[in-house]
Amino acid sequence: MTARVLMFQGTGSDVGKSLMVAGLARAFTRRGLSVVPFKPQNMSNNAAVTADGGEIGRAQALQARAAGVPLSVHMNPVLLKPQSETGAQVVVQGKIVGSAKAADYQHMKAGLMPRVLDSFEHLKQLADLVLVEGAGSASEINLRANDIANMGFARAADAPVILIGDIDRGGVIASLVGTREVLDDDDAAMIEGFIVNRFRGDPALFSDGMRMIAEKTDWSSIGLLPHFSDAAKLPAEDALGLSGPAQRKPSAKIRIAVPILPHISNFDDLDPLDMEPDVELIRVRPGETIPADCRLVLLCGSKSTIADLAVLKDAGLDIDIKAHVRRGGYVLGLCGGYQMLGKTVADPDGIEGPPATVEGLGLLDVDTVLTGDKRLVSVRGTSFDGVGLSGYEMHVGETTGIAGSLVFSTIDGHADGTISPDGRVFGTYIHGLFADDRQRSAWLERLGGQGTDLNYDAQVDAVLDRLAAHMEQHLDLDRLLAIAR
């Protein structure tokens, strides 16, 4: 088979492209179509492991889940993982090919288009419909040369485009009409419809606005999509999701402090905890202190462990964490957070930056050496308390000193992670720990709460079903299928 194609681009970042594709993937799948998601280029430190040992953006993993299809590196052939303000690791078809500064990457892009189109053609043979997500803003004409993410891809793949604007942030008419004005005619001709997303209030009050947009752009209106409140219950890919206020839960019995460091990665590890009614996550930014009543300090993964460790120390959070342990609190480090808890972190080959060896927090008797080889694998095993676990590993670096120590878990016969002698500090390389209902329940009990009866996977699927129904009600899905080609 050769699939029909439909691409969704946005007037800016975080206008709802990822969830639009996820919801439509579930909606069209429920109509009996086979659907696969595709994003030519993604920038995110939240990644998922594919069955063939590669990695793709977490948004594409959620979209694949919505469509009921296994993950493939071809769903996100170019993944950029920021390592600094100006540079990123470049992952092509699931494998690291190097790192590049922003200016250098602009020259790399022309050579990446053949790989992008190769992945796209591969997916077209597997489904009835390919739903493509653009990146950032369609109107970034300064980046149009060698573009592989938006109009450059749409033109190369002959993919009709639906443009999404976010009315919740204001100025949606200007952003949609303005996009039409700055695009050249050939690019603008690829856009065949528009969606106004995240509307609040009486839709009748914006009927004139929808008409004006259509008149000024000559695009079809696909619909005015009301705000979907349950969107917060789905995994967020971008760190933008961490920049807003946290969900307050005054009656929560368990408070967990999460340092928000500049290169935090795989922070979707927090989502299952956030869904628990008895858990309140406290985001602690540099310059803030860890509340004394928190039961657990959770150090998430990091794309730049040494740099984030320096920020943590400069902010005095290392002192806070050690005081938390002295008060009898728990600390759990995941992946990069685990590395920070050890005695030293060494980067002799300059994997993350200039070669260096730095002192860790010294709360675990381990040392880490960062290496060029990356471990990407889904895992199953048993944790130290005999509870089963499933998750995935995604890291560079080898951590030694585990022999003779209490190990966190046993994975396929080998030891993972370690525990301090007093049983208060834990470190593991396993991501997805709290998405495992067994592990999450055990940790809630350890922290003084009750085990959970919440089925996280079922909750996510239920939200995807509601999102699909929301789109069926408010968008013209038949028109979308007619536009797809």
From Swiss-Prot:
Family matches, as PROSITE patterns: GATASE_COBBQ
Keyword match Cell inner membrane: no
Gene Ontology biological process terms, A to Z: cobalamin biosynthetic process
Record protein name field: Cobyric acid synthase
Upper taxonomic lineage: Bacteria, Pseudomonadati, Pseudomonadota, Alphaproteobacteria, Hyphomicrobiales
Domain GATase cobBQ-type: 253-439
InterPro entries named among the record's database cross-references: Class_I_gatase-like, CobQ/CobB/MinD/ParA_Nub-bd_dom, CobQ_GATase1, CobQ_synth, GATase_3, P-loop_NTPase
Coiled-coil positions: none
Taxonomic superkingdom: Bacteria
Function: Catalyzes amidations at positions B, D, E, and G on adenosylcobyrinic A,C-diamide. NH(2) groups are provided by glutamine, and one molecule of ATP is hydrogenolyzed for each amidation.
Keywords for the protein's UniProt record, in alphabetical order: Cobalamin biosynthesis, Glutamine amidotransferase
Family, similarity comment: Belongs to the CobB/CobQ family. CobQ subfamily.
